[in-house]
Design a protein with these regions (language model features):
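N-terminal strand-loop-strand
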Residues: 1-31, 80
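Short, charged/polar surface micro-motifs in flexible loops or helix N-caps
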Residues: 6-8, 18-21, 37, 73-74, ...
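Residues that scaffold the ATP/ADP-binding catalytic core of kinase and kinase-like folds
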Residues: 23, 39, 124
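Residues that flank catalytic or metal-binding motifs in active/ligand-binding sites
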Residues: 25-27, 76, 109
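The catalytic Nudix box helix
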Residues: 31-64, 117
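Active-site-adjacent beta-strand/loop module that shapes the phosphate/pyrophosphate-binding cleft
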Residues: 68-103, 114, 136, 140
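Non-DNA-binding regulatory cores of transcription-related proteins
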Residues: 105-111
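Charged phosphate-binding loop/patch that engages nucleotide di/tri-phosphates or the phosphate backbone
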Residues: 118-142
Length: 142
């Protein structure tokens, strides 16, 4: 999860693409994430997925380990934060395909990203992932 310090802390959150998410907003955004391949280091997977889903090379710098959270679906999400200043207008998301209305179609992995205050990010994020914001603020305060 990229973060930046402007007048105040901001974090970059992503809205999932595709028709299943088109009319869902608050509580449905996410950190950029994905699957860890067998034998892959989880941090390397996070960097790979970040690039696959946004087209941006994962930011360099010190990655803060934010631990893990468990989603209602039972999936475990591992989180890291790294300081970066990315322009949402430069988003060029990867695509996935699915059958929709009887035919296979392609949709963006992420349809938009936004810089948000921690409070706004917690409102937008999947509730379990809001914990990453709290952990980031604690890590930056230390």
């Amino acid at each position: 999860m990229p973060y930046r310090q402007r007048a105040a802390l901001e974090v970059l959150v992503a809205h999932p693409g595709g028709p299943l998410w088109a009319r869902k907003d608050a509580g449905h955004w996410s950190i950029v994430k994905g699957e860890v391949n067998p034998g892959e280091d989880p941090k390397d997977a996070a960097a790979r997925e970040f690039q696959e889903e946004t087209s941006w090379v994962a930011p360099e710098g010190r990655w803060l380990d934010l631990g893990s959270v468990r989603l209602k679906s039972g999936k475990t999400v591992l989180g890291w934060a790294v300081e970066a200043d990315l322009d949402p207008a430069g988003l060029n998301p990867g695509l996935f395909s699915m059958v929709w209305h009887g035919r296979r179609q392609q949709f963006p992995e992420v349809d938009r990203v936004a810089w948000c205050s921690p409070e706004e990010a917690q409102r937008l994020l999947n509730p379990a992932q809001g914990e990453f914001i709290i952990r980031l603020m604690r890590a930056l305060a230390d």
